[in-house]
């Protein structure tokens, strides 16, 4: 150890842990506050949160309440406010971008994702790092601030090859599928990297009805070449309830696809795992890959059809590059 590191100039730079002691306690009424036990004056502050972690609870007038995305976002703002403008730079790592599905207006609707981005930058946030944003163009709401939407394509390829031994990566044996028109960009990139053909489904909806806030899907129509005898990878940004993913997989099996692999960045499984268990038992799907960027219950990790895609090392490398002001992409 260099003797100079003990001088005042190095105070706060060399430490056993670089994790700031932050707390978000609640009052009995359910109201919260942000507390930073450690000083962040002059430091780069990296705040990481999973807005989809529903396992956390707090008490409201004696009743247990699960943390919603709204609660997590409110706590994020409290922590930023607790810093009091003393941090040198504030960076928010939000793997699942809060309100990312509310990125465009249909009728008299709020633009929640754009509002969130503007609110954070108004509070002094310099950079927002997310993964596979539902529509990266939402960054147009904050054109003068840093916004990174990072792809997990490499990690999907890595863990698919590690988890399945007998894959043949060529256009005669494998194909990439987008489950809807919104995921075309991801599927095109994935297919080009591996040198595969791609196809897509589009959703026929009944625009005369609204069910659970959306026009119900009538059918999934396929556009693409023959999938018979091929392994197919369905690539998307998230599994919400999973019904659309299973419908697409069933349609591919009806067209005599060999095996179906589902690869999505965020596995929310909002309706549980029963339908995926049934799809696996019936041979509709073979494997489901999602990342650890959002909360994963133990039940999910134990499923025979599930492959966990670990992004921890990738995030660490990204933060290291950002901290030393190096580019995250090479031209």
Predicted regions and their residues:
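PRPP-associated nucleotide enzymes
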Residues: 1-325, 329-331
């Amino acid at each position: 150890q260099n003797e100079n590191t003990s001088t005042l100039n190095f105070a706060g730079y060399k430490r056993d842990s670089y994790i700031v002691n932050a707390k978000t306690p609640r009052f009995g009424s359910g109201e919260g506050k942000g507390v930073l036990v450690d000083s962040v004056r002059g430091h780069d502050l990296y705040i990481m949160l999973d807005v989809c972690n529903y396992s956390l609870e707090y008490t409201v007038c004696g009743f247990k309440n699960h943390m919603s995305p709204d609660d997590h976002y409110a706590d994020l703002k409290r922590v930023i406010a607790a810093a009091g403008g003393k941090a040198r730079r504030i960076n928010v790592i939000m793997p699942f971008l809060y309100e990312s599905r509310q990125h465009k207006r249909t009728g008299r609707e709020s633009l929640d994702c754009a509002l969130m981005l503007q609110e954070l930058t108004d509070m002094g946030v310099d950079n927002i790092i997310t993964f596979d944003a539902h529509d990266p163009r939402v960054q147009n709401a904050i054109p003068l601030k840093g916004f990174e939407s990072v792809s997990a394509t490499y990690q999907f390829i890595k863990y698919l090859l590690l988890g399945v031994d007998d894959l043949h990566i060529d256009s005669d044996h494998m194909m990439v599928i987008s489950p809807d028109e919104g995921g075309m960009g991801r599927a095109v990139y994935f297919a080009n990297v591996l040198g595969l053909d791609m196809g897509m489904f589009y959703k026929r909806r009944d625009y005369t009805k609204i069910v659970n806030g959306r026009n119900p899907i009538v059918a999934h129509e396929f556009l693409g070449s023959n999938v018979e005898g091929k392994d197919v990878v369905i690539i998307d940004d998230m599994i919400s309830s999973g019904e659309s993913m299973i419908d697409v997989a069933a349609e591919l099996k009806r067209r005599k696809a060999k095996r179906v692999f589902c690869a999505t960045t965020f596995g929310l499984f909002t309706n549980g795992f029963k339908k995926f268990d049934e799809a696996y038992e019936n041979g509709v799907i073979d494997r489901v890959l999602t990342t650890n960027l959002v909360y994963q219950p133990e039940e999910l990790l134990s499923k025979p059809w599930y492959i966990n895609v670990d992004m921890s090392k990738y995030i660490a490398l990204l933060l290291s590059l950002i901290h030393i002001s190096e580019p995250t992409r090479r031209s």
